[in-house]
Amino acid sequence: MYTKYKWLYLSIFFMLLDGIIKYGIRAYFQIGEVLYILPGINICYIENSGLAFGLFSEISIHYRGIFIWLIFFIIIIFIIFLFKCRLIYEHFAYSIVIGGSLGNLYDRIVCGKVLDYIDLYVGKYHWPVFNVADIEICVGMMILIIRGGWNMR
């Protein structure tokens, strides 16, 4: 069973990584402030009250509590999948999805909004601003989809 728990420790590491970066952004940036990094990449401090990429940001505050419980429930399901899977890439994928989800859930519970700060763009066209937790979730899900990790053997 210990080997299963080490993957939860990895999830906590990814959650803390996201949290430390967000702490630094909150400490050194003002909301709306933009810092040019490289062509096509800015650091841009925004707060997202919606879901991924700002979807449903206009939804009533009453429904946000439902979203928090839904996200919490989904994280529990992913933890169950983490304990049932057998392959290392599945453990890794579920661990980073859980870590990213916990990072954003923490923001949503404590701050009421998720801090996003990575701004990718080409010319005047910008991708929606996102954060490290979003990257963790997307990478983990891509690993599961590409490798067929949805199959519980």
UniProtKB/Swiss-Prot annotation:
EC number in record: 3.4.23.36
Cellular compartments annotated: Cell inner membrane
Catalytic activity: Release of signal peptides from bacterial membrane prolipoproteins. Hydrolyzes -Xaa-Yaa-Zaa-|-(S,diacylglyceryl)Cys-, in which Xaa is hydrophobic (preferably Leu), and Yaa (Ala or Ser) and Zaa (Gly or Ala) have small, neutral side chains
Transmembrane parts of this sequence: 5-25, 36-56, 65-85, 87-107, 126-146
Active site as annotated: 116, 134
Keyword annotations: Aspartyl protease, Cell inner membrane, Cell membrane, Hydrolase, Membrane, Protease, Transmembrane, Transmembrane helix
GO biological process, one term: proteolysis
Pathway(s) it belongs to: Protein modification; lipoprotein biosynthesis (signal peptide cleavage)
Gene Ontology molecular function: aspartic-type endopeptidase activity
HAMAP family from the UniProt entry: LspA
Family statement drawn from the similarity comment of this UniProt entry: Belongs to the peptidase A8 family.
Role played: This protein specifically catalyzes the removal of signal peptides from prolipoproteins.
NCBIfam families, alphabetized: lspA (TIGR00077)
Alphabetized PANTHER family for the sequence: LIPOPROTEIN SIGNAL PEPTIDASE
Protein name: Lipoprotein signal peptidase
Species annotation: Blochmanniella floridana
